């Protein structure tokens, strides 16, 4: 087992401000493929100029996180694919320790995630097992996932109905249902700066709020009992409506607007519409 058996896959969208710091932090793995969802020819030229060994593909339309990562996973020629967000930085020895953990687990895992103190790992309390280096958990955040393609053959990849958010939870849920394992490697460290992988300002916030709610309702529809699903999400619609009224009365136009986007995302998902909203850029 060596570094050549791992491919790093990165999906970008208006990510020029962060992607180079991410790539600079990758010291050992040279199989790197990028799919840019904003068809940025200049970014491609800059990346290839600095890192000639990287393969970068441009998409003429914004495919979303899940679809784009599925393309990268399918394009990779290795058993293991390390999915990274462009605003993630690998700390010293992250790759070395991940490789060591793959060997320790004897490749018997579906997902292995490096550790970030800001991450949550489902219902796992990290303080109960402070000395354990490999922690089995319910789910991990999708900003850094080392995926074992051999295990994914029976599970499937990211749900392509989801444009943004909850792809990671959905995948981990299906892994758990398939009686496969998700681990966190506490010896491998990353820094994820969060919500900095794109630089389109308020348009990103509108898109983020819309898809956060759409994906939340979609996720609930997949995994909650019928009556619980409708009770929970009808209450969500009422709550968002009241918040819009509240912020409108307070003349806080920005918060009222973002709540409107949340309401639209939740409503569209509840009535069965696809995740159609895209940022206007």
Where in the sequence are the language-model features?
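Short, well-formed alpha-helical segments that are part of the catalytic scaffolds
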Residues: 10-28
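A conserved acidic beta->alpha catalytic loop
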Residues: 25, 34-44
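Glycine-rich, basic loop-to-helix element that forms the pyrophosphate-binding segment
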Residues: 59-76
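Short aromatic/hydrophobic "clamp" motif used to bind/position activated sugar donors
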Residues: 81
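Conserved donor NDP-sugar-binding/catalytic core segment of glycosyltransferases
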Residues: 89-123
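A short, conserved alpha-helix in the catalytic core of glycosyltransferases
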Residues: 139, 144-147, 151-156, 161-189
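Active-site donor/metal-binding and catalytic loop motifs
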Residues: 184-204, 215-216
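Non-catalytic, C-terminal membrane-associated alpha-helical segments of glycosyltransferases
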Residues: 207-215, 226-281
């Amino acid at each position: 087992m060596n570094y050549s058996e791992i491919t790093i896959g990165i999906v970008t969208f208006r990510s020029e401000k962060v992607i180079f710091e991410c790539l600079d932090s990758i010291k050992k793995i040279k199989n790197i493929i990028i799919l840019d969802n904003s068809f940025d020819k200049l970014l491609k030229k800059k990346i290839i100029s600095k890192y000639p060994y990287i393969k970068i593909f441009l998409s003429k339309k914004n495919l979303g996180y899940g679809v784009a990562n599925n393309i990268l996973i399918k394009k990779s020629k290795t058993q293991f694919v390390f999915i990274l967000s462009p605003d993630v930085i690998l700390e010293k020895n992250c790759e070395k320790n991940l490789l060591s953990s793959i060997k320790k687990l004897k490749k018997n895992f579906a997902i292995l995630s490096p550790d970030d103190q800001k991450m949550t790992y489902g219902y796992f309390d990290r303080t109960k097992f402070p000395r354990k280096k490999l922690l089995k958990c319910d789910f991990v955040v999708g900003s850094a996932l080392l995926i074992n393609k051999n295990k994914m053959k029976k599970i499937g990849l990211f749900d392509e109905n989801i444009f943004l958010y909850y792809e990671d939870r959905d995948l981990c849920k299906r892994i758990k249902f398939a009686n496969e394992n998700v681990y966190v490697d506490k010896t491998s460290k990353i820094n994820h700066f969060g919500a900095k992988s794109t630089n389109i300002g308020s348009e990103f916030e509108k898109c983020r709020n819309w898809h956060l709610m759409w994906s939340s309702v979609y996720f609930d529809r997949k995994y909650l009992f019928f009556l619980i699903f409708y009770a929970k999400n009808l209450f969500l619609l009422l709550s968002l409506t009241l918040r819009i009224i509240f912020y409108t009365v307070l003349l806080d136009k920005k918060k009222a607007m973002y709540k409107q986007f949340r309401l639209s995302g939740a409503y569209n998902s509840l009535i069965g519409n696809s995740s159609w909203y895209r940022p206007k850029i």
